[in-house]
């Protein structure tokens, strides 16, 4: 059986920013091949292997506030 585009299932789930037209046709556009994809709501960037999506242009303070402070042990909480 000859190989045809679009006959193999996607290896990874559809993510925000993926084009349903591209998925149906099985053809890749230059936008998806250059490592950047755009969405009306946010900028998305794919890693070179198309394994992950990264939201670009997010201030570092957002990441800093998302981190949880390290859990304190009971020894640190008791005053000496």
Swiss-Prot record:
Q: Which domain of life is it from?
A: Eukaryota
Cysteine disulfide links = none
Segments for region (Disordered): 1-45
User: Where are the compositionally biased (Low complexity) regions?
Assistant: 15-32
List, as start-end ranges, the regions of compositional bias called Polar residues.
33-42
Instruction: Tell me the Pfam families matching this sequence.
Output: UPF0731 (PF14982)
Family statement = Belongs to the FAM229 family.
Q: What is this protein called?
A: Protein FAM229B
> Lineage of the source organism?
Eukaryota, Metazoa, Chordata, Craniata, Vertebrata
What's the gene?
Fam229b
């Amino acid at each position: 059986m000859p190989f045809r585009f679009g006959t193999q299932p996607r290896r990874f789930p559809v993510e925000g920013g993926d084009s349903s037209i591209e998925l149906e046709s099985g053809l890749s556009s230059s936008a998806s091949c250059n490592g950047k994809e755009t969405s009306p709501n946010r900028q998305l960037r794919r890693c070179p292997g198309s394994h992950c999506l990264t939201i670009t242009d997010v201030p570092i303070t957002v990441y800093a506030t998302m981190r949880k402070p390290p859990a304190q042990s009971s020894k640190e909480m008791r005053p000496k």
